[in-house]
Amino acid sequence: MLERLSTEYRNKNTMNLDEMSIKEVLEAMNQEDRKVAIAVHKEMEQIEKIVRNVISSFQNGGRLIYIGAGTSGRLGILDAVECPPTFGTDERQVQGFIAGGMKAFTKAVEGAEDCEELAIEDLKGIQLNDKDTVIGIAASGRTPYVIGGLKYANYVGAKTASISCNKGAEMSQLAQVSVEVETGAEVLTGSTRLKAGTAQKLVLNMISTASMIGIGKVYKNLMVDVQSTNQKLVERSKRIIMEATEVDYKEAEAYYEKANRNVKAAIVMILLQCEYGEALEKLKDAKGFVKKAL
């Protein structure tokens, strides 16, 4: 029942929300938001377990799949679509699914989140298998679409995890690893796009970033697999080469082009004074880790 969910409680600090000044509303929201990172920190051990599973999936040719409805689904898609430009992943390696399909990203699809079968169809459509990791996201922890997806993921032998914002969440019973970030009552009663959504975004940031570090997508704290899909990212790529090798802009630009705009290869070429082909071989032998290639 909804009344048992802490995300549905009324916030005692905002009972007169409609009478507050704009500044008071903003102060109240900011005060509540400060609690989110603390709540996330309490789940760190569980988040670490998820990251280890995701890294294992990636190392064995598997994928990371997010499933959710409404805000939760949108956050999963948001995290997934940022992976190719940031980490140079194939667009199939990290995917997000939302109840009702992509049209539900911008407009609510009535009844979609209440159907377990829709999630099963979505996961069958990508030939989900035992190499993959599926993460179900739902603030309530009881959305049927997400529950259906987790059941099917377990059935095919995939690794499963859940992210909810209520303790004792129903979907935690279906996931091999469960994260329950208890964010409590929202400023606006039941509006889980607020603190609950913020908590989910923080957890997803951790999972994708730490997992990508674990498969060699980062050198020091530089995104060395960045894809230069626009002029801003072209310039960022050159700056990354400069930071990693301490060469000037002109030399970084020259090696960037010599390396066919492959930032990792350019860094290895400069630091080891080798040719492009040799740099690629060293990176291959090092499974993509720049530090190991050096």
Swiss-Prot record:
Domain SIS: from-to ranges: 54-217
Pathway: Amino-sugar metabolism; N-acetylmuramate degradation
EC number: 4.2.1.126
Keyword field: Carbohydrate metabolism, Lyase
GO terms (BP aspect): amino sugar catabolic process; N-acetylmuramic acid catabolic process; peptidoglycan turnover
Active site, renumbered: 82, 113
Reactions mediated catalytically: N-acetyl-D-muramate 6-phosphate + H2O = N-acetyl-D-glucosamine 6-phosphate + (R)-lactate
Annotated GO MF terms: carbohydrate derivative binding; carbon-oxygen lyase activity; ether hydrolase activity
Keyword Ligase: no
Signal sequence residues: none
SUPFAM superfamilies from the UniProt entry: SIS domain
NCBIfam families: N-acetylmuramic acid 6-phosphate etherase (TIGR00274), PRK05441.1 (NF003915), PRK12570.1 (NF009222)
HAMAP family on file: MurQ
Subunit structure: Homodimer.
Sequence similarity: Belongs to the GCKR-like family. MurNAc-6-P etherase subfamily.
Other remarks on this protein: A lyase-type mechanism (elimination/hydration) is suggested for the cleavage of the lactyl ether bond of MurNAc 6-phosphate, with the formation of an alpha,beta-unsaturated aldehyde intermediate with (E)-stereochemistry, followed by the syn addition of water to give product.
Physiological role: Specifically catalyzes the cleavage of the D-lactyl ether substituent of MurNAc 6-phosphate, producing GlcNAc 6-phosphate and D-lactate.
Record protein name field: N-acetylmuramic acid 6-phosphate etherase
Organism: Bacillus cytotoxicus (strain DSM 22905 / CIP 110041 / 391-98 / NVH 391-98)
Gene: murQ
